[in-house]
């Protein structure tokens, strides 16, 4: 952060928010390739890419930008990328990475100045991702309906540019952003129905992540504004929001727009018990009210996306589910609030009678169907979930094959340790263990019986997690304490780092 402050003060761009001249500074591209500053941990497939981003390449890029960038924008040329020259892919990626660093500077400086100037206000609306787990345990069982939402991606580059205008007043940076979206990143290929927009694009994940977060923040900003206006509740989280350009003017504009466009539905949202939780592109809106209110919220979200963001929302992106009858898939868990009938015997005078009390219990299950589909794609089992061998790993050593299976099995056990129903997890672990044995048997051209007899019981202990292995050493496997701890529900806060287990359509990445 101090580096950014020094650079901005030296060039004198902090007061006027002019970011475009920073594009011609060599240190910007050095910062773009500084892995200590790059929190997104970009992994490039081309191992020699960092060697190409030398000082000479940056100087040559700066010279080309000085000489020809304006000609590329205004000249009537059939090749819009001619100014980049023969190193089109290299220079375009260098420019986009440098631009990604530049656009993050205002947000970092404003947040730092806010934290240094005053204490952080307590927020009940915006909390850490780790607060999802206590929310499920404490509040989820008391709610009735949930709105399962897939946030649509912006399909028009101009919408992202308009969103960015609220943060930066530099017109040149806005033109450059528009130029990147239209020319370099082949926007049309990103919005085809068969391909979803990957915010972690291999070309520049940091840049696309920034654009995606800007879009989601704009969506949630309007959502919470109307939420607070409709319920007549004072917002307790406005202090922790990033400062905007013309913030109050934007709020007044929203009041005018939604008073005209949504005046017929604004009065409908008066439920003070709505809970909003989001992780990446999926969000849930849970409430204790009637399904009529949830239908009104659904109608509001669809109109917001279509009229304000110009995004056509498919009907399947918003579902209304009853928590007692249906499960929702969130963070890789199938969660629902099941009704349990508890019979309590009471005695008054000499007459005994039974009182039935209905209690709600929060349950989380392993998405067994999705996991088996992913195992089938990775060739660990057939569609009927029968384990098969992994012939592509036959060239590896025995220890390497076992370690790969053990790592997959431990990741699954660690991630789904918060599940209350682990029968599906036991089945997945069984498939992986048997698939490992069959892979080794096929490699050595032996039989399963002979191979297991040679390995012994220690082979299956390798598939236990470190926590399970430690508990097994303290308590006997046959004891009640071992069974209770082994089947207990534990939320590990580091499971959010296992991103592939959240979206099961990309789960095959874990099984490679």
Curated annotation (Swiss-Prot):
Membrane-traversing stretches: none
Entry GO terms, CC: chloroplast
GO molecular function terms listed in the Swiss-Prot or TrEMBL record: RNA binding
Pfam families (alphabetical): Intron_maturas2, MatK_N
Keyword Ligase part of the UniProt annotation: no
Cell compartments where the protein resides: Plastid, Chloroplast
UniProt keyword annotation of tRNA processing present: yes
GO BP field: mRNA processing; RNA splicing; tRNA processing
Top-rank lineage group of the source organism: Eukaryota
Predominant location category: plastid
Keywords: Chloroplast, mRNA processing, Plastid, RNA-binding, tRNA processing
UniProt xrefs under InterPro entries: Domain_X, Maturase_MatK, Maturase_MatK_N
Family statement drawn from the similarity comment of this UniProt entry: Belongs to the intron maturase 2 family. MatK subfamily.
Function, as annotated: Usually encoded in the trnK tRNA gene intron. Probably assists in splicing its own and other chloroplast group II introns.
Name of this protein: Maturase K
Record gene name: matK
